[in-house]
Swiss-Prot record:
Purpose: Hydrolyzes ribosome-free peptidyl-tRNAs (with 1 or more amino acids incorporated), which drop off the ribosome during protein synthesis, or as a result of ribosome stalling.
UniProt key word Kinase: no
Entry-linked InterPro entries: Pept_tRNA_hydro, Pept_tRNA_hydro_CS, Pept_tRNA_hydro_sf
EC number: 3.1.1.29
Site (Stabilizes the basic form of H active site to accept a proton): 91
Enzyme superclass (EC): hydrolase
Protein name, UniProt field: Peptidyl-tRNA hydrolase
Subunit details: Monomer.
Positions of the catalytic residues: 19 (proton acceptor)
Family: Belongs to the PTH family.
Single Gene Ontology MF annotation: tRNA binding
Catalyzed reaction equations: an N-acyl-L-alpha-aminoacyl-tRNA + H2O = an N-acyl-L-amino acid + a tRNA + H(+)
Residues given in the record as tRNA binding sites: 14, 64, 66, 112
Gene that specifies this protein: pth
Length: 185
């Protein structure tokens, strides 16, 4: 079983914001897999898909971004998901807008949603798809990440979304994340 988590903030006011790229990409993946999200008892929306006989859980925590681990940890325990089978999709301020970077494991790198997952899972050996949103030039980080993409930024994000989805689909198809990293990084 694999678990793919998209990070974001719940609520209409956060839809289509830079901080919600994880939600947007997981929504697109659910659409491609023809599954819909249901509210679970674990403070998350969960969609279940099957590919080549393997169960795939798509997850959108219903906590706020900085508390994502509160949903992810219990879900992993309940479904007995190994950290090696967890992939988290999230925004990254340190990558240029539209750049996608895959990572096998590691620290939170300043991302509070990832920090929360590491804390609740008790392990940092899980996969990530980091989507660059760039760093704000003249505004606060909070205002920037909670802001919507400008019309000029949308095309770059759309390209990143295509790349991120292709990378996730490649991992689901062949389970060799190192090869996927070599192809997409």
């Amino acid at each position: 079983m694999k678990m793919i988590v998209g990070l974001g903030n719940i609520g209409r006011q956060y839809a289509q914001t830079r901080h919600n790229v994880g939600f947007m990409i997981v929504d697109e993946l659910a659409s491609k897999l023809n599954v819909t999200f249901q509210t679970s008892k674990f403070e998350a929306q969960v969609a279940t898909a099957f590919q080549d006989g393997e169960k795939i859980l798509l997850v959108k925590p219903a906590t706020y971004m900085n508390d994502s681990g509160r949903a992810v940890g219990p879900l992993m325990s309940y479904y007995n998901v190994d950290p090696a089978d967890l992939l988290v999709i999230h925004d990254d301020l340190d990558l240029p807008l539209g750049k996608v970077r895959l990572k096998q494991k590691g620290s939170a790198g300043g991302h509070n949603g990832i920090k929360s997952i590491i804390s609740h899972v008790g392990d940092q050996h899980f996969k990530r798809v980091k989507v660059g949103i760039d760093h704000p030039q003249k505004m606060s980080v909070v205002d920037y990440v909670l802001g919507k993409f400008t019309p000029a930024e949308v095309a770059k994000f759309d390209d990143a979304k295509i790349t991120a989805l292709a990378a996730v689909e490649a991992w689901l198809a062949n389970d060799d994340f190192t090869a996927v990293m070599n192809q997409y990084n």
